[in-house]
Amino acid sequence: MARKISLDMTRNVGIMAHIDAGKTTTTERILFYTGVERKLKEVHEGQATMDWMEQEQERGITITSAATTCFWKGHRINIIDTPGHVDFTVEVERSLRVLDGAVAVFSAVDGVQPQSETVWRQADKYKVPRLAFFNKMDRIGANFDMCVSDIKEKLGSNPVPIQIPIGAEDQFEGVVDLIEMKEIVWPVDSDQGQHFDVKDIRAELKEKAEETRQYMLESIVETDDALMEKFFGGEEITKEEIIKGLRKATIDNTIVPVVCGTAFKNKGIQALLDAIVNYMPAPTDVAMVEGRDPKNPDVLIDREMSDDAPFAALAFKVMTDPFVGRLTFFRVYSGFVEKGATVLNSTKGKKERMGRILQMHANNREEIEHVYCGDIAAAVGLKDTATGDTLCAENAPIVLEQMEFPEPVISVAVEPKTKNDQEKMGIALSKLAEEDPTFKVRTDEETGQTIISGMGELHLEIIVDRMKREFKVESNVGKPQVAYRETITQSCDQEVKYAKQSGGRGQYGHVKIILEPNPGKEFEFVNKITGGVIPREYIPAVEKGCKEALESGVIAGYPLVDVKVTLYDGSYHEVDSSEMAFKIAGSMALKQAATKAKPVILEPVFKVEVTTPEEYMGDIIGDLNSRRGMVSGMIDRNGAKIITAKVPLSEMFGYATDLRSKSQGRATYSWEFSEYLQVPASIQKQIQEERGK
């Protein structure tokens, strides 16, 4: 069966933003105007198609990235609606990895908010081309120009308006299209925004439109020498040349086109769809896919993005579906695959059989026979494939670049309400951990408790909620615990001779290491053994011993991070030496060195942004200071004060309630993980006492 829509007419885009900027509503409108939805649905009524989990509909926020497909002007658009809440960063990260472009939705009232910055940085990491949609133009305080300068200043990008708004707040009627130089106006009685009028630009907007168009043209020609020559030579630049130049500059990440509207009031969405089709890349616009040879990871393999190349795909999400079981979402980067085919999971070196293949529309599904290059689909029946694994043709193995996920920052102990549910809880937690790489489960060796860790209180709340709804396991949850870490502040030279003789064969391992701080590098092991003083086959055992010793630090038993170990000398015994002996020697050497290397405890610190009426500002700043917060800035916006601070996570529990009472419910806050920093000596002592160390 041949593909229905050619690859160059396909767009894979994500809708990304800060929580509450109106992402899901924007996506719902896109589905309505492209004919997928028969009736408009509202997020605040809990009806949104893309928010299909019960918890999402209750809370009115998006937790998982729902994938859906729609069609516009002969193009196929695969859309992923990503969460905006900081606790679900992993969903954004894995979506961006498999997309070709992204629509960044901003609230025209609030501009760039903390989570917008986080998501923007994630998109920078994967070099994802973007266009900006300023939503909520009908709301009080909407300010188009402020949003443009916010993107420039806070995100360091080059926003170029290709529209300007007609009116704002309750006077917002539509937009001026700066390429066509026409007004697009949605009448008040328009049939749910489906019909609009295209008119000549009114006199009072002419000057502003000409001025902004000139800026748009100058920005485009700066990226193209031939156009620049033509433009400054006084020649007219055609509409086709503008679109082509803008498309190239967007794909090259030198320009971010800006459009605006109000999704809730049904204005501006059709023009946004035109911009997606005109300026977002097709899979063919993106460079060749690069991967590595599974047998020799140093060898790079280039793979052409075409249906004729060998099959290669990346699994970017695993989830359990109540009807079909385990679903694996994947993006095809080259070739095609049909249902029932056997493919190779090159990350794990295992063969997998593609059972049914489903095209997802939020949580509705349509069975399909084939998936072609550039498409996103979900497979049933992949038993061993996890997020980030590569699936490929058996005769052309390749491993695509994997995704990196942040480590959890918060933990709680959970136990089932009834003893009978112990086993069910174990199964539920392991299934949920399979779906979400930032959710970890472990058993505390000292207490025997089950500890779950994640990206924030909301993240873990939803996990506990899902256990109850999907797996019928009710649980008691302990107090939140912060994921502290340990590190060292100076270098140390350490020698350990591990020798054991108790009749028969003994144990002998002798190592000399240097342990030194290695900020931001987690763990690094360097082998400087020469002349075979330690045989080559024992070196990995020393590294393994060091790695195991890192799991429990020397101050309070938290993981030891950001260290470098150099193995430079030692000795062995012909008969008594073994891998086990060298592993124990490596572990002992690292522990002893860490004790002498001035160890310290690190704590997760969050960037917090509080928006408050001025009269509560003093109390709120005082409260942040009392939480060991460092206030770094204050600005005015729309009559409110915005306070920025860095606050340790351990001081943020219960903050939402305190903030409500201090501001009579009028202040709001958002936060995102910033970094790990050393705790003060008094806090370190307190942590040690609590841990009984």
Curated annotation (Swiss-Prot):
Alphabetized Pfam families for the sequence: EFG_C, EFG_III, EFG_IV, GTP_EFTU, GTP_EFTU_D2
Annotated GO biological process: ribosome disassembly
Listed CDD domains: EF-G, EFG_III, EFG_mtEFG1_IV, EFG_mtEFG_C, EFG_mtEFG_II
Keywords: Cytoplasm, Elongation factor, GTP-binding, Nucleotide-binding, Protein biosynthesis
Record-stated family: Belongs to the TRAFAC class translation factor GTPase superfamily. Classic translation factor GTPase family. EF-G/EF-2 subfamily.
NCBIfam families the record matches: EF-G, PRK12740.1-3, PRK12740.1-5, small_GTP
Role this protein plays: Catalyzes the GTP-dependent ribosomal translocation step during translation elongation. During this step, the ribosome changes from the pre-translocational (PRE) to the post-translocational (POST) state as the newly formed A-site-bound peptidyl-tRNA and P-site-bound deacylated tRNA move to the P and E sites, respectively. Catalyzes the coordinated movement of the two tRNA molecules, the mRNA and conformational changes in the ribosome.
Protein name (record): Elongation factor G
